[in-house]
């Protein structure tokens, strides 16, 4: 049952952070950033927030990471307003490489299909 609550809190934080990034954060470095997943620690003290950026450029990814780190305080404050939790978890932003990995596998499968 506790695991179900952790998953629900993670989904709610994902939804709220996406909304906050679109509506409240005015930093141009975080434009085009989408939250793909949130993994919560068991005690809900921290949340690892995975994100993707529309651009494939390494400089844009680095700028997005810096922009998210800079906006962490604003995001936590807005989460505190919108969520009914005793303590808002610390947010740790990490780039989600699963989409790029999936695209690479797709390209390899297409290349194999063309050869046969």
UniProtKB/Swiss-Prot annotation:
One of its GO terms (cellular component) is cytosol. It comes from the Bacteria. InterPro entries: KH_dom-like_a/b, RbfA, RbfA_dom_sf, Ribosome-bd_factorA_CS. SUPFAM superfamilies: Ribosome-binding factor A, RbfA. The keyword Cytoplasm applies. Keywords: Cytoplasm, Ribosome biogenesis. It is found in: Cytoplasm. GO terms for molecular function: ribosomal small subunit binding. PROSITE patterns: RBFA. Monomer. Binds 30S ribosomal subunits, but not 50S ribosomal subunits or 70S ribosomes. PANTHER family: RIBOSOME-BINDING FACTOR A, CHLOROPLASTIC-RELATED (PTHR33515:SF1). One of several proteins that assist in the late maturation steps of the functional core of the 30S ribosomal subunit. Associates with free 30S ribosomal subunits (but not with 30S subunits that are part of 70S ribosomes or polysomes). Required for efficient processing of 16S rRNA. May interact with the 5'-terminal helix region of 16S rRNA. This is Ribosome-binding factor A. The lineage of its organism: Bacteria, Bacillati, Bacillota, Bacilli, Lactobacillales. The gene is rbfA.
């Amino acid at each position: 049952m506790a695991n179900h609550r952790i998953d629900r809190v993670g989904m709610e934080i994902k939804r709220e952070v996406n909304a906050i990034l679109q509506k409240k954060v005015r930093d141009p470095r975080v434009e085009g950033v989408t939250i793909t997943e949130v993994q919560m620690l068991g005690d809900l003290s921290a949340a690892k927030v995975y994100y993707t950026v529309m651009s494939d450029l390494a400089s844009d990814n680095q700028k997005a990471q810096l922009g998210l780190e800079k906006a962490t305080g604003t995001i936590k404050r807005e989460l505190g307003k919108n969520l009914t939790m005793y303590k808002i978890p610390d947010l740790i932003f990490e780039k989600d490489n699963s989409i790029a990995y999936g695209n690479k596998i797709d390209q390899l499968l297409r290349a194999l299909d063309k050869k046969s």
